[in-house]
UniProtKB/Swiss-Prot annotation:
GO molecular function: antiporter activity; UDP-galactose transmembrane transporter activity
Signal peptide: none
GO-annotated biological processes: transmembrane transport; UDP-N-acetylglucosamine transmembrane transport
NCBIfam families: nst
Keyword check for Transmembrane helix: yes
Organism of derivation: Rattus norvegicus
Organism phylogeny: Eukaryota, Metazoa, Chordata, Craniata, Vertebrata
Stated name of the protein: UDP-N-acetylglucosamine transporter
Length: 326
């Protein structure tokens, strides 16, 4: 059953990540009259939606009893303040990471951003080894190297992308690069920290997500006030929101739930591989839908390497002797 949940959650993550990349790219490049929606408010709204979804799931687990729901929330959150406070650290880092990625996408071309952001897989592996004591075998370390090479091939910029990158100033490229590098390290640390909390305590993944979303909303609102306070007071919190914006926000909220399930039933490194597969899928779809990418032989080589690395990571050679030895 756990194996089925593992691959089901990974499959949903690939779908969610692919859809989010395509819709977010389209929403940020679509030319419209009036102000564009603020990314800082989108992060906050996504956190609120995630909290609402998790409360509903806890309600469902409580046999649709409001009284049981209130008791569970009171016992697991209010009566365990130290357990709740544990989520403040990863929540703050996740909020910072979400805002950094908007900064990165505003200052880097898509190819450079996506290649560089895959460094989070390596940082996740290193934090998993150091914080969780996870043992990676030779095949798993090799798969990480192959994955990095494959993603680099997949996102190798074409001539048109190189020309577009020249339009970006050196300063903005440096800002974008620093943003995505910090996001890579924060993603690795926060993801492994959250995994450690989930697997060492008995609280459900939905309760943990409510706690995570609570702090995320607070940190997110602080970010809105500091960076976009004037714009919000002038044009409103939901300025620039349209149907596409709400799709992006819902997909972001869904992503938090799916990632939590992946961390619970799989692990952070498999989450990274699923994200890499979604990059290939989103690039292919963008060729047919957005028509802004032409696949090359280098792309197909990279796709093969990423898929091979995914299977290699899951390869578990059985020892010839001492089968009962831990």
């Amino acid at each position: 059953m756990s194996a089925n949940l593992k691959y089901l959650s990974l499959g949903i993550l690939v779908f969610q990540t692919t859809s989010l990349v395509l819709t977010m790219r389209y929403s940020r490049t679509l030319k419209e009259e009036g102000p564009r929606y603020l990314s800082s408010t989108a992060v906050v709204v996504a956190e609120f939606l995630k909290i609402m979804a998790c409360i509903f799931l806890v309600y469902k687990d409580s046999k649709c009893s409001v009284r049981t729901l209130n008791r569970v929330l009171h016992d697991e959150i209010l009566n365990k303040p130290m357990e709740t406070l544990k989520l403040a650290i990863p929540s703050g880092i996740y909020t910072l990471q979400n805002n950094l990625l908007y900064v990165a996408l505003s200052n880097l071309d898509a190819a450079t951003y996506q290649v560089t952001y895959q460094l989070k897989i390596l940082t996740t592996a290193l934090f998993s080894v150091s914080m969780l004591g996870k043992k990676l075998g030779m095949y798993q370390w090799l798969s990480l190297v192959i994955l990095m090479a494959g993603v680099a091939f997949v996102q190798w910029p074409s001539d048109s992308q190189e020309l577009n990158s020249k339009d970006l100033s050196t300063g903005s490229q440096f800002v974008g690069l620093m943003a995505v590098l910090i996001a890579c390290f924060s993603s690795g640390f926060a993801g492994v920290y959250f995994e450690k909390i989930l697997k060492e305590t008995k609280q459900s993944v939905w309760i943990r997500n409510i706690q995570l979303g609570f702090f995320g909303s607070i940190f997110g609102l602080m970010g809105v006030y500091v960076y976009d306070g004037e714009l919000v007071s002038k044009n409103g919190f939901f300025q620039g929101y349209n149907q596409l914006t709400w799709i992006v926000v819902v997909l972001q909220a869904l992503g938090g739930l799916v990632i939590a399930a992946v961390i619970k039933y799989a692990d952070n490194i498999l989450k990274g591989f699923a994200t890499s597969l979604s990059i290939i899928l989103s690039t292919i779809i963008s060729y047919f839908w957005l028509q802004d990418f032409v696949p090359t032989s280098v792309f197909f080589l990279g796709a093969i390497l990423v898929i091979a690395a995914t299977f290699l990571y899951g390869y578990d050679p059985k020892p010839a002797g001492n089968p009962t030895k831990a």
